Amino acid sequence: MNPAYSNQATVDISLDLKCVQKIMVPGTSVKSSKEALRLSRIYPDVIYSTAGIHPHDSKSIIEDPSSWFEFQEIASSQECVAIGPCGLDYQRDFSEPDVQKEIFEKQLLLATSLGKAILIHERSAQQDVLDILDKFQNLPPVIIRSFMGTAEEAIKYLDRRFYISLTGYLCKDKSDTGVRRLLDNGTLPLDRLLVETDSPFMYPNTRASKLPQHVKTGITERSLLYLHRYCTFQRNEPCSLPAIVEMIAAFMKKSPDEVALATSFNALKLFGLS
């Protein structure tokens, strides 16, 4: 969980606006997973937590092996509905690749034993991620979170029946082979799609010059009001979710209600929410 959200203000804003009904707070280390669990107990049935060791933080488990036992206890909690984000990130070298792989596999084993969905973080490491995932025969549902890759990379995930989760990165992707193409050409079906804000990152800049006009006009005034009043480039918020859904709908040439209904159903099913 990002330190920016250690207080309740960001939760209260989104719930008061009624733009979201449930919030997933991810843990990216033992400490932040514990804090995410604490928040989920303050807001039962509204906030849910995940327990993850982000690739960047993998070395912390090697440095303090006993912390893994505390992590297992957190992950086993009822309020924790998924394991992750976990995976591999070769864009930065906060943890050595071999260490990342070791801790990634430990989390996959844990998720499989608990039967909880897996949130995958992958940057410039797809083949190694796939090689590790392919070792497991009976994985729980796998979600590729905050996907920023190419359409070709997405197909490799979709062929394995994984889910793809998209963010406001849509506004930044200017390539002909990336996320936008996934939506434009129907490569990404609704029954494999999730939507997230990845707050406080991935602010959806609806004023981006390369954002198609039909996408800009597809964003409602109400969603823009939430976005511009409560979010900034430095601090995205959960209340940006409606704008992201509307952009995705415009790219897919579907109604926002259809996208919202499908992605909400997927989330409820995958994470066992009521």
Give names to the regions the model predicted.
Residues 1-274:
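Mid-domain alpha/beta scaffold segments of enzyme catalytic cores
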